[in-house]
UniProtKB/Swiss-Prot annotation:
Phylogenetic classification of the source organism: Eukaryota, Metazoa, Chordata, Craniata, Vertebrata
One GO CC annotation: endosome
Domain VPS28 C-terminal intervals: 124-220
Keywords, alphabetical: Acetylation, Cell membrane, Endosome, Membrane, Protein transport, Transport
Organism, as annotated: Mus musculus
Membrane topology, as annotated: Peripheral membrane protein
Protein name per the record: Vacuolar protein sorting-associated protein 28 homolog
Similarity comment text for this entry: Belongs to the VPS28 family.
UniProt cross-references to Pfam families, sorted A to Z: VPS28
Main location (coarse class): membrane
Residue(s) carrying N-acetylmethionine: 1
Entry's localization field: Cell membrane; Late endosome membrane
GO biological process: endosome transport via multivesicular body sorting pathway; negative regulation of protein ubiquitination; positive regulation of protein catabolic process; positive regulation of ubiquitin-dependent endocytosis; protein transport; ubiquitin-dependent protein catabolic process via the multivesicular body sorting pathway
Gene3D superfamilies: 1.20.120.1130, 1.20.1440.200
Amino acid sequence: MFHGIPATPGVGAPGNKPELYEEVKLYKNAREREKYDNMAELFAVVKTMQALEKAYIKDCVTPNEYTAACSRLLVQYKAAFRQVQGSEISSIDEFCRKFRLDCPLAMERIKEDRPITIKDDKGNLNRCIADVVSLFITVMDKLRLEIRAMDEIQPDLRELMETMHRMSHLPPDFEGRQTVSQWLQTLSGMSASDELDDSQVRQMLFDLESAYNAFNRFLHA
């Protein structure tokens, strides 16, 4: 009936403008992309920490669960901020102002550098939980960054073992303690400058990840 009558694009329709269908990119090269990715990671960590603080205030998580999660986020925050810190961003306060990030509870945790459950007493249970989480992550991060010399790994691993020993709540046969002990024995048979080979690094990462997950399961039990 209307053969031959051209269709009229609706109001606001792009019509024949292919440029309007092109993907808009925030970056021009790989360096800029990494910069934005790093800022996004820092933004996400701060927002997650703010949500965790609110959840703890509302009794949605137990003190042990909160302590472990907050300790992990503080480690992640430090790593994320190092990637962003520079001439444009000199402090976390400046980052929050620039991106209108209103997270006062998270900022308080970051400035105190410890979960709210932790006291100054090193024998405090929550202090031990925080230290165990932090040390697990520190050792695994070193291995992922190919830091594998005996004298660079053993001190943190020994401190991890000693901290777990201070936790009387951990059962004597806790698998994570046994895993760390076995790797300490392996490292003690090496010279300071000796390095773990690729196979050992892969196995150690697997073992520590399993031990870390077991520790988290213990906290949630």
